[in-house]
Amino acid sequence: RLREIILKRAWSEKRKALTSTFDGHELDASMLLVEPLGFLEADDPRFRMTVEAIGKDLKRGDFLFRYVVADDFGRPETAFTICTFWYIDALVALGRGEEGRALFETMLARGNKHGLLSEDIAMATGELWGNYPQTYSLVGLINSAIKLSVSWEVAS
């Protein structure tokens, strides 16, 4: 029952995507997690449309905002690093692995000389911002690397 309510009230026909709030129209990159959390299957058209809407609305160059609406700190100015990894994972789930891999390689290049990433990345410069090193960002990198990797069966 709860799933039905969420799908009815969080889906925006206007945006053709799952939104950040019930009966709302604003996008949030956290909706990229509906597939890995098992809420929607990768072949569900609502997942594909949500990924496409988020890519169109929240992606700037190689990075993603989590959302673009003002919060307690104002309008976001930097990309939330883990969101780009969530997007990479969504691309892989949709069968767009080459696109995901290219973006993953770009993100790898953003790490410092030790391969560490920060919480945020400045959109214009690629400079690391925010909490550093950021566990969320590094876990996102690891998860994406696993999703992009060839299985042991295929590799052997």
Language model segments and positions:
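Functionally critical, mid-to-C-terminal surface segments that flank or help form catalytic/ligand
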Residues: 82-86
